[in-house]
């Protein structure tokens, strides 16, 4: 466990494993909608384990593409109302802003015309959910601090009781709205839930229903740590092994797995261009 995890675990662990609520939510609860928090570190510092396969420029390009595709999938998921991206990277902010249609979010929502709805849906199918970008508290503070800042922003209006939150990592380029929607539906049956990555040791999705605190413990072995903190592990019946939600990218072999699943358009464009130019051949 990292020093950051140790700094918060004792008080949080006691709260999580207490009998404050049953582990399973009553079946007669209304349908759940979610705010998704996506933490994104400065891209020049990301994916260092790919350094032996990709140049620094390629790593930055890949990370930016994966974030765009991951966020687009989240915003296209019907049960997601809002996506909060936590980042200090201006290029990521610019990438996410580039796909926004004309007019403010409020203006688009206020226009009831079928023409406006059809145009927005056809040209910007990822824009069902509202997008907010909030600054990272401090790059030195780490991933879990960024997540806590995003969750605080997500719940700033109505507080803990008002918003169900899901933390989604930004390196899931093969994610589809159906993948995330199915996982969130399964997660809605539990006060806290977790989806593990393809090898079962890491975490790609961490959820907490409204009224429930979320205690992120991302880092090596995070899946086991999150389970110990009271998050129900969603198995392959809920999230299949071949789901894009499980396939994050840390190593070159992960890019091959992503290519087999079919990445989103931005990541596809990057990988296809590298293939044409003969770049990153050991990773693609």
Swiss-Prot record:
<feature type="binding site">
    <location>
        <position position="222"/>
    </location>
    <ligand>
        <name>phosphoenolpyruvate</name>
    </ligand>
</feature>
<comment type="similarity">
    <text>Belongs to the CofC family.</text>
</comment>
<feature type="binding site">
    <location>
        <position position="203"/>
    </location>
    <ligand>
        <name>phosphoenolpyruvate</name>
    </ligand>
</feature>
<comment type="pathway">
    <text>Cofactor biosynthesis; coenzyme F420 biosynthesis.</text>
</comment>
<comment type="function">
    <text>Guanylyltransferase that catalyzes the activation of phosphoenolpyruvate (PEP) as enolpyruvoyl-2-diphospho-5'-guanosine, via the condensation of PEP with GTP. It is involved in the biosynthesis of coenzyme F420, a hydride carrier cofactor.</text>
</comment>
<dbReference type="GO" id="GO:0052645">
    <property type="term" value="P:F420-0 metabolic process"/>
</dbReference>
<feature type="binding site">
    <location>
        <position position="219"/>
    </location>
    <ligand>
        <name>phosphoenolpyruvate</name>
    </ligand>
</feature>
<feature type="compositionally biased region" description="Basic and acidic residues">
    <location>
        <begin position="105"/>
        <end position="114"/>
    </location>
</feature>
<dbReference type="GO" id="GO:0043814">
    <property type="term" value="F:phospholactate guanylyltransferase activity"/>
</dbReference>
<feature type="region of interest" description="Disordered">
    <location>
        <begin position="94"/>
        <end position="123"/>
    </location>
</feature>
<keyword id="KW-0547">Nucleotide-binding</keyword>
<dbReference type="Pfam" id="PF01983">
    <property type="entry name" value="CofC"/>
</dbReference>
<dbReference type="InterPro" id="IPR029044">
    <property type="entry name" value="Nucleotide-diphossugar_trans"/>
</dbReference>
<dbReference type="InterPro" id="IPR002835">
    <property type="entry name" value="CofC"/>
</dbReference>
<dbReference type="GO" id="GO:0005525">
    <property type="term" value="F:GTP binding"/>
</dbReference>
<keyword id="KW-0808">Transferase</keyword>
<keyword id="KW-0342">GTP-binding</keyword>
<protein>
    <recommendedName>
        <fullName>Phosphoenolpyruvate guanylyltransferase</fullName>
        <ecNumber>2.7.7.105</ecNumber>
    </recommendedName>
</protein>
<keyword id="KW-0548">Nucleotidyltransferase</keyword>
């Amino acid at each position: 466990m990292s020093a950051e995890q140790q700094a918060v675990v004792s008080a949080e662990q006691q709260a999580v494993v207490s009998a404050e609520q049953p582990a399973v939510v009553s079946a007669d609860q209304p349908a759940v909608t979610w705010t998704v928090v996506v933490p994104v570190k400065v891209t020049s510092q990301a994916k260092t384990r790919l350094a032996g396969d990709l140049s620094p420029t390629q790593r930055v390009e890949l990370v930016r593409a994966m974030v765009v595709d991951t966020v687009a999938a989240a915003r296209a998921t019907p049960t997601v109302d809002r996506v909060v991206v936590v980042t200090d990277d201006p290029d990521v902010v610019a990438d996410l802003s580039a796909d926004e249609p004309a007019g403010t979010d409020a203006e688009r929502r206020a226009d009831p015309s079928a023409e406006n709805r059809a145009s927005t849906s056809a040209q910007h199918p990822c824009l069902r959910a509202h997008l907010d970008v909030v600054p990272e508290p401090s790059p030195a503070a780490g991933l879990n601090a960024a997540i806590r800042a995003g969750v605080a922003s997500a719940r700033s209006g109505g507080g803990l009781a008002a918003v169900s939150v899901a933390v989604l990592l930004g390196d899931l380029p093969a994610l589809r709205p159906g993948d995330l929607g199915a996982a969130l539906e399964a997660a809605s049956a539990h006060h806290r839930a977790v989806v593990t990555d393809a090898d079962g040791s890491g975490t790609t999705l961490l959820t907490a229903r409204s009224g429930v605190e979320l205690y992120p413990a991302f880092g090596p072995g995070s899946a086991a740590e999150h389970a110990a903190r009271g998050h129900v592990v969603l198995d392959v019946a809920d999230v299949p092994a071949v789901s894009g939600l499980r396939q994050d990218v840390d190593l070159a072999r992960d890019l091959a797995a992503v290519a087999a699943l079919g990445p989103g358009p931005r990541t596809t464009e990057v990988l296809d261009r590298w293939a044409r130019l003969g770049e990153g051949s050991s990773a693609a």
